[in-house]
């Protein structure tokens, strides 16, 4: 199995992390033509360790590009999160998808579950930016950067990441620059 994602970045920092990823990801359909996991994006106005269901339709939406994520939100000065999405049976995956209004309709989540689907491709304004994919559960989402490598299928947290970097301040900050390492 691949060790890099659709952006050419390592899936995880360690070999064990890559194994844990594939154990969690399984035979998910959210892969590129080379079988590498696709990276999706979600913009938000606050720090997140997990994403919750929409208050309207019960789905959790992600865009195929950072631009699509930013256009789909009113976040403004927020953060954009790159994530992996695990979805084994996606409604509309091979076709044009389902209209956003239909996906947000009352009872649509129940229809997906009854139909055996765990995600839906959504037709919306983000289509010009690569499209939108919505999943049913927070456990289907994991961070594509800085993940600790656990990829716990029962944990809705997108990351259990360890500290990623440091800031080194000189003794006299007026005479030497600070160094930020990531």
Walk through the language-model features, giving the residues of each:
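Active-site and NAD+-binding cores of ADP-ribose-processing enzymes
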Residues: 1-182
């Amino acid at each position: 199995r691949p060790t890099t994602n659709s952006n050419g970045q390592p899936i995880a920092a360690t070999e064990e992390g890559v194994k844990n990823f594939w154990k969690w990801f399984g035979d998910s359909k959210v892969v590129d033509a080379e079988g590498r996991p696709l990276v999706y994006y979600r913009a938000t106005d606050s720090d997140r360790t997990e994403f919750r269901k929409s208050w309207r339709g019960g789905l959790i939406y992600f865009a195929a590009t950072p631009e699509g994520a930013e256009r789909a939100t009113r976040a403004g000065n927020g953060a954009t999160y790159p994530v992996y999405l695990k979805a084994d049976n996606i409604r509309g995956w091979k076709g044009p998808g389902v209209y956003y209004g239909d996906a947000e309709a009352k009872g649509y989540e129940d229809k997906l579950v009854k139909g055996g689907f765990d995600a839906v491709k959504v037709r919306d304004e983000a289509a010009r930016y690569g499209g939108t994919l919505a999943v049913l559960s927070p456990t289907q989402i994991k961070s594509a950067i800085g993940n600790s490598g656990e990829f716990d299928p029962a944990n809705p947290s997108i990351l259990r990441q360890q500290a990623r970097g440091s800031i080194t301040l000189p003794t006299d900050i007026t005479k030497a620059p600070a160094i930020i390492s990531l």
